């Protein structure tokens, strides 16, 4: 619990006490929403015209036809006024991490207990490719879960990496389980490197895989103890 002030019931007037309570309530509400959401609420309620994408201009374009008005009534003006692009200066920028966007990224990093957090609007697939393009160079050996998402396969192709696959288990129901611990042994990985036709003539003992990618969790909900 935190103490922010006192109310002197027998000294202050009811009007003053009411203003005091309203001030504290407003302070609570102002700090309740995370940074970007608060900026989005403020922008949508500001009454500014929309001269940027999307082309419905804050929902106005939908009001020009009967079916458009049905659409507008179904979703509501509030949502359509808040449907904006990254050209709105008041909301900050995803590309250079400024303004409320940057504040929200810092807030998310704090919540996740991470050093940094960057928002991506193209989903996990694009996030995976970004990590790989930053980390992996053509010809690098990478160790990858054979039950990986297709974005990892795309990353292998795009970066020119040489994959060494770890084979997961599968039960009699066809459900793919975790990768056996034996697959992670150095000797097992070196054996896979020696057997890889794309690495013919390479000294397996000298190879240092550039990245390890696991599917966490699997599509059937299997979780690894990554510690």
Please give the residue ranges for each predicted region.
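Substrate-binding/gating loop at the entrance of the active-site cleft, primarily
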Residues: 144-163, 168-170
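Conserved N-terminal alpha-helix of the aminotransferase class I/II PLP-enzyme fold
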Residues: 68, 73-126
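Gly/Ser/Thr-rich loops at beta-strand to alpha-helix junctions
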Residues: 98-101, 122-127, 148-151, 217-222
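Active-site phosphate-binding strand-loop segment of PLP-dependent enzymes
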Residues: 174-227
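N-terminal glycine-rich, Lys/His-bearing helix-loop that initiates the first secondary-structure elements
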Residues: 1-81
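Conserved beta-loop-alpha segment that forms the PLP phosphate-binding cup at the N-terminus of a helix
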Residues: 116-144, 150-155
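Conserved acidic residues
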Residues: 4-7, 115, 140, 210
């Amino acid at each position: 619990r935190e103490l922010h002030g006192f109310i002197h019931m027998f000294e202050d007037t009811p009007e003053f006490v009411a203003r005091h309570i309203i001030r504290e309530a407003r302070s609570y509400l102002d700090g309740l929403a995370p940074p970007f959401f608060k900026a989005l609420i403020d922008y949508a309620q500001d009454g500014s015209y929309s001269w940027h994408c999307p082309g419905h201009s804050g929902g106005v374009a939908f009001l020009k036809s009967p079916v458009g008005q049905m659409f507008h009534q179904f979703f509501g003006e509030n949502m359509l006024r808040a449907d904006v692009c990254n050209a709105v200066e008041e909301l900050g920028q995803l590309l250079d991490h400024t303004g409320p966007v940057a504040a929200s990224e810092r807030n998310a990093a704090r919540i996740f207990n991470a050093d940094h957090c960057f928002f991506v609007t193209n989903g996990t697939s694009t996030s995976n490719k970004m990590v790989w393009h930053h980390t992996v160079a053509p010809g690098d050996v990478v160790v990858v879960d054979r039950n990986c998402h297709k974005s990892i396969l795309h990353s292998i192709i795009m970066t020119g990496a040489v994959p060494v696959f770890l084979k997961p288990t599968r039960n009699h129901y066809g459900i793919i389980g975790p990768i056996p611990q034996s697959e992670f042994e150095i000797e097992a990985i070196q054996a896979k490197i020696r057997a890889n036709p794309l690495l013919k003539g390479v000294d397996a003992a000298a190879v240092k895989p550039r990245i390890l990618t696991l599917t966490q969790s699997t599509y059937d909900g299997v979780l690894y103890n990554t510690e």
